[in-house]
Amino acid sequence: LTKRAQRYAGFATNFGCYIPKTMPFGLVSAPFTFSKFMAELLKGCEDFCVPYLDDVAIFSNSLDEHVKHLDVILRKIGNAKLKIKPSKCSLGRKTVKYLGHVVGNGIRSPVEAKIQAIVNFPAPKTKTEIRRLIGMIGYYSRYIKDYAKIVEPLTNALRGKNKREQITWTPECQKAFDTIKGKLVERPVLHAPDYSKPFIIQVDSSNTGTGVVLCQRDEKGEEHPILYLSRKFIKAELNYCTTEKECLGIIYAIKKLHHYLDGQPFKIETDHNPLVWLKSNVGNNQRLMRWSLALQPFNYTIIHRPGKSIKHVDALSRV
């Protein structure tokens, strides 16, 4: 810390005044400052390294390449006079635990300890406890099919002006609680995106919500999910006609997933046949015309698939 910063970081106790010479934990600006420092330190290594505060993930295609990448990173850290604790390092692994996920071999899944914490979570008795539970499971919502539908009884229990009042734990709440636990215990797996292959967005909307799956197909034609999305329609959107609701699902998907889709062709699969003509003919519907214009920067093709062939997306929309 600079001399000026040391004065502001100091604190007084019964035993005297303590002034840190280096940045301690607990300062409001510490995460930003350290993140900026690590980003500058590892500049030029973005192709094989991702820093997050004091965690550095290094990924390589082979062991020889990994050794070279390690050498580059360790030299940069050494030149900056930073220290690494060996017991907290994990080198040359096929899979690693990173930010609550087990990552490696092109797939990711939730960390077992995090799942166990949710499984051991007692039935909530207050709105505060429900929010804590939803916060825990919400981090893994992209692993769970029809997540919005499953947690609906829990989110409905949060209604009311009093944010801390006791709740009535209904059988529907218990069922949602048990279902979420069961879904996570199954150890869901998501695949890493392969940018050499086209992305596929599968969209299906019901009367009350929309469900989305981002996936890719391998050489055998098997679908591999990358993530799941779903949301309810707000009050105004509930009044939309069927075609508008289906198109709204596409708009929602592309807004959420544009960083996967920018600059490359992709397919949109829907069970609503009229949307196949979205690019060329939307009639006189002003809302569909605006959405069609909003989609023009993207290179997409809409393909009709019967609802029976995309059941997992159909389930996501039943919220």
Segments predicted by a language model, with ranges:
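Retroelement reverse transcriptase polymerase core
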Residues: L1-P265, P274-N281, N285-W291, Q296-I302, ...
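C-terminal accessory regions
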Residues: K267-E269
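Short, Lys/Arg-enriched alpha-helical microdomains
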Residues: K311-A315, V319
